[in-house]
Amino acid sequence: MHYFRRNCIFFLIVILYGTNSSPSTQNVTSREVVSSVQLSEEESTFYLCPPPVGSTVIRLEPPRKCPEPRKATEWGEGIAILFKENISPYKFKVTLYYKNIIQTTTWTGTTYRQITNRYTDRTPVSIEEITDLIDGKGRCSSKARYLRNNVYVEAFDRDAGEKQVLLKPSKFNTPESRAWHTTNETYTVWGSPWIYRTGTSVNCIVEEMDARSVFPYSYFAMANGDIANISPFYGLSPPEAAAEPMGYPQDNFKQLDSYFSMDLDKRRKASLPVKRNFLITSHFTVGWDWAPKTTRVCSMTKWKEVTEMLRATVNGRYRFMARELSATFISNTTEFDPNRIILGQCIKREAEAAIEQIFRTKYNDSHVKVGHVQYFLALGGFIVAYQPVLSKSLAHMYLRELMRDNRTDEMLDLVNNKHAIYKKNATSLSRLRRDIRNAPNRKITLDDTTAIKSTSSVQFAMLQFLYDHIQTHINDMFSRIATAWCELQNRELVLWHEGIKINPSATASATLGRRVAAKMLGDVAAVSSCTAIDAESVTLQNSMRVITSTNTCYSRPLVLFSYGENQGNIQGQLGENNELLPTLEAVEPCSANHRRYFLFGSGYALFENYNFVKMVDAADIQIASTFVELNLTLLEDREILPLSVYTKEELRDVGVLDYAEVARRNQLHELKFYDINKVIEVDTNYAFMNGLAELFNGMGQVGQAIGKVVVGAAGAIVSTISGVSAFMSNPFGALAIGLIIIAGLVAAFLAYRYVNKLKSNPMKALYPMTTEVLKAQATRELHGEESDDLERTSIDERKLEEAREMIKYMALVSAEERHEKKLRRKRRGTTAVLSDHLAKMRIKNSNPKYDKLPTTYSDSEDDAV
């Protein structure tokens, strides 16, 4: 009864929860509520496993034979010299001869000077002048003769005659670059005003500088930027020198044997003769000492000296590993002949000398050389000169074995180093003999016109070294792991035999890699494949109790699932790992305080007292791991060092022109050969007076006398004009002149206004105060106002009338004068003048004479005032 009440309460709680949670879930059963916790089809898959009947049986594999661990690669030791392509240019000294011609056209004004044109050109110096004057006397001619526009033209320094000028050092000489020249001034002629003049300057310049040429040495460039299209090794003899390229007519080239050049600083001839080349171009002549090509240049150059080089054979190719460089170089096993490289004559000489030096300082007491120096062409265009070495203790062991076997010839070969013994396996001497006998005699040959090109970076070699290091470590590690794994599997096979007896289905599923059901049939197991069931067709039931019994319960939860299409629901039990059991055989006696977790999909279904409680997330359950960690040995630390094939200096020096040096020389050219800080003051007035004096001096004594007068007057005029010009050029003088002009304009404007005022109203202009008083009095009288007694008594009527008469006569006199002036201008003869005079007399007699006013006033007048 207690069990029944508890189930009823559980069902009521589930139904009430479903009713309150959603109004649309009314009238649902408890089975449907439990079904709502089922999985979607994406979350998990269930399997239906039929019972095995023995149609398919399996057995466990017997133990395997485990492989042996991998043997490490054996390396031989030796000394190696690495060669790379020589990209540096061939440098040599040249002497440049040329004459710098500057023609300057000037224009002289009255107060200024201008350079209207400046023409500059370089002309070559003849070979005869070089041999006779420059290297013979340390001098150079002031005359320049050159070809322009198919015509020979001549130029003379300072427009004077030809002369031999001493060569003097320039102001900026260095041990690498020296120069000499004949003058440091640019000749400039300033003529008289309004005249063009032209002056010519010829500066003979000798420059000693560096020149460069790169492979294939068909031309060379000089430090100043000039380029000569001729090989520096060209010559008339020997025949190989005459075969060098030359891009000029043969007449422009000359080679002199036993030539003694002069040191222009010490003024002494050289003590040793040389074979001297001279080349004439359109703008310069260049000379240099000839030398054989094979003794001066080499297409390869020494890059690195490796004191400890390891060599091994991997996949039919040599691996040269240099730990100190962190690089590995790969080559064929056939030797390479460096004599076949064009201009590669230096490889053997430098390699043998460097190897001998390293062996003498480091290996002489502990090792012996084995065979001769071997040469190999490595990937990337590098030559590896390799000298195998062998420790003395190991060599003594070989000698004792040879002496014991009475093999005298081989012993002598080893002692005399006639064979290159390479120790691939040091376990037996027969292997060494076989290596010597089977060593290939073929050598790689190149065409005579072939040159080796080296890469500019050895990152590939460093990566190869890193790869070989990692490959060796990983391969050894995997070899040991494979052996240990095989042995572990053989030992665990016993556990598998025992496990399949305890749980055949789980063991068979683990070994076959798929879900199967199994049972033991003696020494073999019968299996049957499981079928996947969709998660949507699987429903978990809420009770694990057997309905027909009160004390029997199911040990696994009950489920309903459907299998296939148009199939009804099948009731079964939930097995392990989402396995569906189509039977109800898993039962147990009911126990108190029952609590179980069963895997259902990706989560766990919790049952308490054989009733479903809730779904528990798998993440909420702690994991007990059975995985055994594999602790492997880590790689040892290996630093990748930066390694450059070519340095910055080599890359910067790869071209024939150093543009920084060319730009620097061009900027210093004027400073080296011309004094640009010297200032020459030119007086154009003196030139003008000197020209006039020379003109009159050519006319004899009379001309000289006239010239003195004219030159004196002209000098005064020029001095006056120069003074005025100097005053005007002064800013204060110009300001004063401007102020004076402005003041004059203002004064002229005021005078013009006064004259116009005098013409229009003379009395107002002459007597402004009197006219103002009279105007005011007339205004008051016009308006009927009476003046004060003072004003009325201050004016004498008689005097006023006399003043009026005086003004009238003054006007008549002025009119008469104007009339006379007009008559004289018209020049009409004496009749007009006489008639005018008679008119004056009539006017004069008709009017009373003007009486002068008394100077004193009478008493009556004073009383009136």
Curated annotation (Swiss-Prot):
* Annotated signal peptide: 1-21
Short sequence motif Golgi targeting: positions = 809-812
Record keyword Transmembrane present: yes
Side of membrane Intravirion, spans? 753-865
- UniProt region (Disordered), positions on chain: 843-865
Q: Does the keyword Transmembrane apply?
A: yes
Its GO CC terms are: host cell endosome membrane; host cell Golgi membrane; host cell plasma membrane; membrane; viral envelope; virion membrane
Q: Which Pfam families match?
A: Glycoprot_B_PH1 (PF17416), Glycoprot_B_PH2 (PF17417), Glycoprotein_B (PF00606)
What does the UniProt keyword field contain?
A: Disulfide bond, Glycoprotein, Host cell membrane, Host endosome, Host Golgi apparatus, Host membrane, Host-virus interaction, Membrane, Signal, Transmembrane, Transmembrane helix, Viral attachment to host cell, Viral envelope protein, Virion, Virus entry into host cell
- Annotated site residues (Cleavage) in this chain: R434, D435
Please cite one Gene Ontology biological process associated with this protein: virion attachment to host cell
Q: What is the residue range of the motif Internalization motif?
A: 850-853
The membrane topology of this protein is:
Single-pass type I membrane protein
Give the highest taxon in the source lineage.
Viruses
Modified how: A proteolytic cleavage by host furin generates two subunits that remain linked by disulfide bonds.
Q: Which residues lie on this side of the membrane: Virion surface?
A: 22-731
- Extract the ranges annotated as region (Involved in fusion and/or binding to host membrane): 106-112, 191-198
Glycan attachment points: N27, N184, N332, N364, N406, N425, N631
Q: Which InterPro entries match?
A: Glycoprot_B_PH1, Glycoprot_B_PH2, Glycoprot_B_PH2_sf, Glycoprotein_B_ecto_C, Herpes_Glycoprot_B
- Looking at the UniProt entry, the stretches that span the membrane are 732-752
This chain's function reads: Envelope glycoprotein that forms spikes at the surface of virion envelope. Essential for the initial attachment to heparan sulfate moieties of the host cell surface proteoglycans. Involved in fusion of viral and cellular membranes leading to virus entry into the host cell. Following initial binding to its host receptors, membrane fusion is mediated by the fusion machinery composed at least of gB and the heterodimer gH/gL. May be involved in the fusion between the virion envelope and the outer nuclear membrane during virion egress.
From the Swiss-Prot or TrEMBL record, give the protein name: Envelope glycoprotein B
